[in-house]
């Protein structure tokens, strides 16, 4: 089910990111835009880095964040890479196929 939020361009779709707020017509979560902005990337630059988004969509995401900060912070925390994994090299171990 797609649920339109009170912000233009922002929707929730239970089939995309478990219903996390996203930009309508994309799979881009509001949190992705917010994380760039919190790193100091200005909105104009965000729309250049994410060229599939318009300035209106970027500002809609930031407006949604302004009204729902606790919710977006929760999504950011859920998707944070644990410090123990940051900078580590994950190694692929080849396994022979099991033949029955």
Write out the residue ranges for each language-model feature:
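N-terminal first-folded block
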Residues: 1-28
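Long, charge-rich, low-complexity alpha-helical segments
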Residues: 29-100
